[in-house]
Amino acid sequence: MPRIVNPLDEMLFKEVLKEQQRIRVYVERARYGKLKTIIEGIDEKEFDLEDIAKKLKAKLACGGTAKNGRIELQGDHRDRVKKLLAELGFSEELIEVE
């Protein structure tokens, strides 16, 4: 018999997970000396990285992708990413910006 899950319990569980994620935001050099912002530490099994990347790209007006368990954004967006992730429900105290 399949386990019946209350949708409200599942939503609360996801909110608690969001608040416990340790997220690291840093910049890497890409091709031709360009910069890219890397966001690591979001559990890709529990959260849709593609959806989070899509929201961040729209807010930051930049290109990017979600691959290998991390989000890559074109350009240096470290200063704004922390605030935007907090707006999406992630704990601001657990977001480390380098």
Curated annotation (Swiss-Prot):
Pfam families linked to this entry: SUI1
Molecular functions (GO terms): translation initiation factor activity
Keywords per UniProt: Protein biosynthesis, Translation regulation
PROSITE patterns in the cross-refs: SUI1
InterPro entries, alphabetized: DENR/SUI1_TIF, SUI1, SUI1_arc, SUI1_arc_bac, SUI1_dom_sf
Top-level taxon of the source organism: Archaea
Xref: Gene3D superfamilies: SUI1-like domain
Disulfide bonds: none
GO biological process: formation of translation preinitiation complex; regulation of translation; translation reinitiation
CDD domains linked: YciH_like
Keyword Protein biosynthesis found: yes
NCBIfam families linked to this entry: PRK00939.1, SUI1_rel
Similarity-based family: Belongs to the SUI1 family.
Name of protein: Protein translation factor SUI1 homolog
